[in-house]
A protein has these predicted regions:
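Nucleotide/pyrophosphate-binding catalytic subdomain
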Residues: 1-140, 299
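Electropositive, surface-exposed helix/loop patches at the edges of structured domains
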Residues: 52-69, 132-156, 192-207, 257-278
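Short phosphate-binding/catalytic loops that engage adenosine nucleotides
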Residues: 15, 153, 219
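A conserved active-site cap/scaffold subdomain adjacent to cofactor or substrate pockets
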Residues: 123-171, 176-179, 184-189
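A conserved regulatory-domain signal marking ACT and ACT-like small-molecule sensing domains
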Residues: 166-300
Length: 300
């Protein structure tokens, strides 16, 4: 509906353009809510149609978030699907750049909902943007970045509130500018701790079964930690009945304990001062660190 309204408005103000249906161009499988792009068919459709249209007009309007399934039924592309649609068209058309418009001035080092003194990145490597989005930065999804990275197409994140501002450029640079810690909060996390009933060790066979179960339930694991006798996973909130079904199924072979309403804190390029300030006064449940990333599951 939105694209139809905009197309009609463009007609009224005399802006020459073409209106095309995304479902005729982005072809997907039939996983309706998280459809996977069929890149071969999509490339063929976009190259054949869109390049021809651009010979007569400079502006094309189409929908984001949706594609056409194998039976020509409408599918959706999942979280941040509209940005992903732009990346798909850009990849297939070998675009010079892509700009996505948000309600923030660019890619920030923290969510303004939690921090008053956020800072904007001027430039970010593709790899770092993917890392940030993987850990939960909501501004961009990894699947939007990957096709652009494959062809070195720059991605600009700008604010529709201040369209003349530069925003953030994501490209093949070597380091973020400026170099500073990034903070990501994921609230309302659930922690499941799983123990073999026979006091055996948690080995590959156990982990394989547990991973398969989480995949079947469509649950994305945000943090995991295993010891010789237990395996713990942290994930986003799910419906009570789904959680109970998961626990019931796990309880056939394992003892299960769980905690809810936790916060997962991730710091990229952390400093010890940043860690101290963030976990001060909080009950620490799990802590993990690598060379560049520190994660803390805490009870507020």
């Amino acid at each position: 509906i939105g694209t139809t309204i905009i197309s009609k408005y463009f007609e009224e103000i005399g802006l020459e353009h073409s209106f095309v249906l995304a479902t005729n161009h982005i072809k997907t499988n039939n996983s309706y809510r998280r459809a996977k792009v069929l890149w071969g068919d999509t490339q063929k459709n976009i190259t054949k149609s869109i390049l021809t249209i651009f010979e007569s007009v400079d502006t094309i309007i189409t929908q984001g978030f949706i594609g056409g399934g194998e039976n020509n039924e409408t599918t959706t592309l999942g979280r941040e699907g509209s940005d992903f649609s732009a990346a798909v068209f850009a990849y297939c058309l070998r675009a010079k750049s892509v700009t996505i418009w948000k309600d923030v001035p660019g890619l920030l080092n923290a969510d303004p909902k939690y921090f008053e003194d956020t800072r904007k990145f001027e430039q970010v490597p593709y790899s770092e943007a993917i890392e940030l989005s993987y850990y939960g930065a909501s501004i961009i999804h990894p699947k939007t970045i990957k096709p652009l990275e494959n062809l070195s197409i720059p991605l600009y994140v700008k604010s529709f509130l201040s369209p003349k501002d530069e925003g953030t450029r994501i490209d093949c640079c070597s380091n973020t500018k400026p170099l500073m810690p990034s903070y990501i909060f994921k609230d309302n996390q659930t922690l499941l701790s799983i123990f073999p009933k026979d006091f055996s060790f948690v080995v590959e066979e156990n982990l394989s079964n547990i991973f398969a179960l989480f995949a079947r339930y469509g649950i994305k694991i945000n943090l995991m930690q295993n010891s010789a006798l237990s395996y713990s996973v942290c994930f986003d909130p799910i419906k009570d009945d789904l959680l109970q079904r998961l626990i019931t199924e796990l309880s056939v072979s394992y003892s299960v304990k769980y905690n809810r309403n936790l916060r997962l804190i991730t710091i990229r390029r952390y400093t010890e001062d940043a860690i101290r300030n963030l976990i001060k006064g909080k009950k620490l449940i799990i802590e993990q660190r690598s060379r560049l990333t520190a994660q803390f599951l805490v009870k507020l």
